[in-house]
Structures are given as C-alpha cells and as structure tokens.
Design a protein with these regions (language model features):
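Conserved catalytic SET/PR domain of SAM-dependent protein methyltransferases, capturing the structural core
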Residues: 1-154
Length: 154
C-alpha cells in the first residue's frame, strides 16, 4: 500500500491502523483523495464510505484512507464535490487524522458495524450506530459536514 510522505500509518492497540499527519496542515488544506468505485450496500466491504442511500465508495485494494478512524471531534471532513479529505482546522505533525463516521453512514447497526466510540471528546456520541439513530439536535449540529444525501433527509 502506498502511503504519501505527508502521512504515516501506525498500528494502535484497540484501534487497529490509524493515520497520522507527518507534517503540519492548515485549515482547508486537502489531505488526500477518497478513492474507489461506487458499489451497492450488498457488495460493499466494511471499510466502504457511504455517499448515497445505497451508494458506497469501496475498493478491492487497501488504500491509506482505510486507516482514517472515527472521532466525534474530527480533524478532517470529506469535501463531497472533490471527494477529498480536507482539514477542518490546523493540524499538527503527529496528530491522528480522523473524520466523523456519522456524517456519512446512515445505519451501521444493519450490518452489525456499530461500535463504542473511544475518542474521549467532551461531545462524544457514545455508541456510533449511524445518522439514523441521532436526535434532531445532533443531526443539525453535524449539518455542515454531512454527505449531501443525509442533508436531503434532515
């Protein structure tokens, strides 16, 4: 697997592989491209990113973006026009790169992919089950980061 010089993949106990910044990034800077092909839910792997009601970006190859873990206080967002991961704020070298899975995934329970979040942020959602299970208030807080298909169902 190719890992760009500006990124580093490290195995973390209890999390698996995690992606880290190998240099400083400025807010709004593109970190990396979300690669793969569009598949239906029935064909997608657990690492796929949901971009539509039944559309997932997935690949038969392992890409470095598969190592981006969830956080309720993420450092990255997906720019859905360019399909790039973009810095939400300034990121320091050595910091873990994360995005909020609730901004793309509608129902993780359906495929038994829900999990207890370990991000430790004060705004932690706890059990990550998917956008479907959030309160209206929680959904509205995530609105600026949401995949377009989720914005439509708000």
């Amino acid at each position: 697997m190719y890992i760009p010089k500006h990124l580093k993949s490290i195995k973390i106990k209890g999390k698996g592989r995690s992606l880290f910044a190998n240099r400083n990034f400025k807010k709004g800077e593109t970190i990396l491209k979300l690669k793969g092909v569009i598949k239906k839910c029935s064909e997608a792997t657990p690492d796929a990113v949901q971009i539509g009601e039944d559309e997932f970006i997935d690949s038969k190859y392992r890409y470095v973006e598969d190592h981006i873990n969830h956080s309720c206080n993420p450092s990255l967002k997906i720019d859905f026009d360019s399909m790039n991961f973009v810095a939400l704020r300034n990121i320091k070298r050595g910091e873990e790169l994360t995005y909020n899975y609730l901004t793309t995934e509608y129902d993780l329970v359906r495929d038994n992919l829900d999990f207890d979040c370990k991000c430790g942020s004060k705004n932690c959602f706890g059990r990550i089950k998917g956008f479907k299970f959030l309160t209206k208030t929680q959904k509205l807080k995530l609105k600026p980061l949401l995949a377009p298909y989720l914005k439509k169902i708000l």
